[in-house]
Amino acid sequence: MQTIIWNHLSETEKRKVIMRPVQQNGENIQQAVNAIRENVAYNGDRALFELCEKFDGVKLDKLIVSADEIQAASSRISVKLRNAIEQAKTNIEAFHKAQQNQEIDLEIQEGVRCQVVTRPISCVGLYIPGGSAPLFSTVLMLAIPAKIAGCKKIVLCSPPPISDEILYTAHLCGVETIYAIGGAQAVFAMAQGTESVAKVDKIFGPGNAFVTEAKRQVAQNSTAIDMPAGPSEVLVIADESADPEFVASDLLSQAEHGADSQVILVATCETLAKETALAIERQLALLPRAETARKALNHSRIFIAESLEQAVEISNEYAPEHLIVQTKNARKLLPYLDNAGSIFLGAYSPESMGDYASGTNHVLPTYGYTKTYSSLGLADFSKRMTVQELTPKGFKNLAETVEVMAEAEQLAAHKMAVSVRLAKLNI
């Protein structure tokens, strides 16, 4: 990791050094995803079977995972892992239940009643990546709030063969239907519907560049998505009180996600920065994914800030997905931290806790989107509607205000909708 003293940079250099690596979602990916979209649209299930064999190397005779298969998978999960998943589920449920909205019902003025009511999104689709490290924890993060929100139908897609852990966790969380479909084709199947796959209203979940591009495309039509996605990232603010071994482990826990991940340390102490760099090398030697982590470290940075105030400014400008604060009084910085997906305060709040079991959601905006997007929560699985109800007296008292405004905007029909009612009231 390159170490840079922040105050030695010009304003132009500062903007440049906190830029993320360019995402390689080029024309080739877009063209490939376009072809998959058209194939699924025209050929439905047949396309899904063909693409599964082509990309996953699995020849399926059905797309829906049977209850017997789910039961068999669940029986192979160790008691130790079951207990861990159930503990995480309990914590995540508690935190997301606390997010349930109180409905707003106000009399704004006499005879004018306004409300906000919340309704669940009817049908949601969850995408869970497969591969050598199945992300069953993401099932918890998506299915639990969907269930609490009251979504009527929850379906899940994951590339075959689906891991036992994913099947067990999905069943535990009440997912009704599981499809053995992966990649961009899964996104298009859920967005468009096929003979076997239910069309959904909103799609959630992470994925590779092809899945991300597919989600971008469906979001331009009639299917909503959770949020824009990019490579995973973490920024750590640390002062002289921080433990370099802790800081190094937090940086590496993010770097091991992928070669395109980025990790940033903003330290107010050069000694800590040097000790952390040495600790990273020691810990790297112990990691199975050391090669991946090292690639991520190649485009990561250590910034030396003159103060915690400056460290906060750097963090707010970078707007990280994960923000870890390892300082003497971490909570004192919280009021000044504006842009982050999830914040981890103190030496004993590693990102791993939020990734799995503290209760917060690990589905977070990346690539600077935390300036405008929030971490996933219960609200993402529901929608708000406003309601207004006026009595004749309330209508009469507000009528002139609306007529004047409608006339000023030259919308005669808007004014007429008020005038005809006033006439009926014999005013």
Swiss-Prot record:
Transmembrane segments: none annotated. InterPro entries: Ald_DH/histidinol_DH (IPR016161), Histidinol_DH_CS (IPR001692), Histidinol_DH_monofunct (IPR022695), Hstdl_DH (IPR012131). It catalyses: L-histidinol + 2 NAD(+) + H2O = L-histidine + 2 NADH + 3 H(+). Its cofactor is Zn(2+). Substrate binds at residues 232, 254, 257, 322, 355, 409, 414. GO terms for cellular component: cytosol. Its EC number is 1.1.1.23. One of its GO terms (biological process) is L-histidine biosynthetic process. SUPFAM superfamilies: ALDH-like. The active site is at residues 321-322. Keywords: Amino-acid biosynthesis, Histidine biosynthesis, Metal-binding, NAD, Oxidoreductase, Zinc. Pathway: Amino-acid biosynthesis; L-histidine biosynthesis; L-histidine from 5-phospho-alpha-D-ribose 1-diphosphate: step 9/9. Binds 1 zinc ion per subunit. The keyword Cell division does not apply. It is an enzyme of class 1 (oxidoreductase). GO terms for molecular function: histidinol dehydrogenase activity; NAD binding; zinc ion binding. Gene3D superfamilies: 1.20.5.1300, Nitrogenase molybdenum iron protein domain. NAD(+) binds at residues 127, 185, 208. Belongs to the histidinol dehydrogenase family. Catalyzes the sequential NAD-dependent oxidations of L-histidinol to L-histidinaldehyde and then to L-histidine. This is Histidinol dehydrogenase. It comes from Haemophilus influenzae (strain 86-028NP). The lineage of its organism: Bacteria, Pseudomonadati, Pseudomonadota, Gammaproteobacteria, Pasteurellales.
